[in-house]
């Protein structure tokens, strides 16, 4: 994992999300700095995704067995054009030496669609090219920034190996065909796409955006994602899904990450979701409400909550938390890697079931002011109430007799999510 330089700090001015035109690889050199960052070194291949000019490292060619898939720089092709493909001798090799490349005389050509689709209320993504776009990123790029019209992106069954980053999108639903049928994934992490050497990322609103997740929503509002799997294929600091936005709803989404598998900043609602990750499974300063969702990690803390005073943190109702037998997990920590604490951090479990959680519940709570609450936690295997006699002294067990109003408030998404009432089975609107 990359470390911060001695002069590295958060940007002193809010990151500028205003733009009238989305920059692309056609008109802007990948690595061109935005915000207060320095240029991204052009040591490896870079591509601009979603208008983020600092750009991303990507894999121009991915080889699996005898199949080589070539990925072009984003947004470079024109509608209604014919292109030819050449591959120099030696770029790709077969064991028997029979492949000598592709020349122009081989006439390997392809033609793009004659024109772009109309901006309608529904766009179709199909990996085989039978829709309006064959990538999720392509459909998101097509939708104007700050669009007030509701747009539905239907993602057909398929394996979408792509790095997704989108900013300034409003009122978009991204709907797959099911967790087992639609998968969006990429091999990305903090080492492959690190933060700038001189700028820290993502701690507070207005700081420099992160580039290390497989799927990133940045400065977005009123987004729904449902019925798909979103995953990173690498270990380390590697989110499957990274959210910076308001009123982001996830339904029946399987998120697979490593450390910081889900980064949640803003207001986020999850229902009937699955999350698999490593330590600090959920990271962020946002308000997250999860209902009937399952959380798994390989041991260690499930969260590193950083919400501030006046904002709720993470609340879980009728969820499960588990790790495999032979390992132990905990609800989370509030202390930073340098020993300081987030004094207003909030992590609340209501009617949840757990397996292989340490007796203390939380590994570290750095301040008595943190709201680490628990009510009616039961064992996933036996169904019996868990033994809470050794819980962390800064945590609190809620009781029906004394805390009925507070328990009921925590069962209400609007209480946690700044008054937002998402579609939800918990309140009969889903």
Write out the residue ranges for each language-model feature.
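Acidic, low-complexity Ser/Thr/Gly/Pro-rich repeat segments typical of extracellular/periplasmic
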Residues: 1-117
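Sequence-level preference for short, compositionally simple segments enriched
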Residues: 114-130, 134-430
């Amino acid at each position: 994992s990359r470390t911060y330089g001695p002069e590295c700090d958060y940007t002193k001015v809010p990151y500028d999300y205003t733009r009238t035109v989305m920059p692309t690889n056609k008109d802007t050199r990948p690595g061109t700095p935005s915000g207060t960052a320095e240029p991204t070194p052009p040591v490896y291949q870079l591509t601009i995704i979603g208008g983020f000019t600092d750009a991303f490292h990507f894999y121009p060619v991915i080889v699996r067995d005898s199949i080589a898939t070539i990925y072009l720089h984003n947004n470079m092709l024109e509608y209604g054009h014919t292109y030819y493909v050449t591959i120099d001798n030696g770029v790709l090799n077969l064991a028997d030496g029979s492949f000598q490349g592709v020349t122009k005389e081989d006439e390997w050509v392809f033609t793009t669609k004659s024109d772009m689709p109309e901006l309608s209320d529904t766009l179709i993504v199909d990996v085989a090219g039978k829709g309006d776009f064959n990538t999720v990123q392509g459909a998101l790029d097509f939708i104007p920034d700050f669009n007030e019209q509701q747009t539905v992106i239907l993602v057909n069954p398929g394996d979408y190996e792509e790095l997704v980053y989108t900013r300034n999108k409003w009122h978009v639903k991204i709907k797959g065909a099911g967790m087992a049928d639609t998968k969006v994934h990429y091999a990305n992490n903090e080492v492959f796409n690190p933060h700038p050497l001189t700028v820290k990322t993502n701690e507070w609103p207005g700081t420099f955006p992160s580039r290390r997740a497989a799927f990133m929503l940045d400065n977005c509002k009123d987004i729904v994602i449902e019925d798909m799997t979103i995953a990173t294929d690498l270990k380390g600091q590697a989110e499957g899904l990274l959210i910076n936005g308001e009123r982001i709803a996830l339904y029946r989404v399987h998120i697979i990450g490593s450390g910081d598998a889900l980064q949640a900043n803003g207001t986020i609602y999850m229902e009937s979701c699955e999350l698999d990750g490593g330590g600090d499974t959920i990271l962020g300063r946002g308000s997250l409400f999860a209902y009937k969702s399952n959380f798994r990690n390989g041991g260690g803390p499930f969260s590193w909550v950083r919400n501030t005073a006046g904002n709720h943190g993470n609340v879980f109702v009728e969820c499960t938390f588990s790790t495999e037998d032979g390992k132990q997990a905990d609800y989370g920590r509030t202390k930073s890697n340098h020993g300081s604490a987030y004094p207003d951090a909030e992590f609340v479990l209501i009617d949840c079931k757990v397996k292989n959680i340490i007796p203390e519940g939380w590994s570290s709570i750095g301040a008595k002011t943190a709201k680490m609450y628990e009510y009616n936690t039961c064992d996933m295997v036996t169904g019996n109430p868990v033994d809470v006699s050794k819980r962390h002294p800064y945590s609190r067990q809620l009781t029906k007799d004394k805390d009925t109003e507070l328990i009921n408030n925590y069962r209400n998404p609007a209480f946690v999510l700044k008054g937002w009432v998402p579609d939800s089975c918990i309140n009969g609107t889903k």
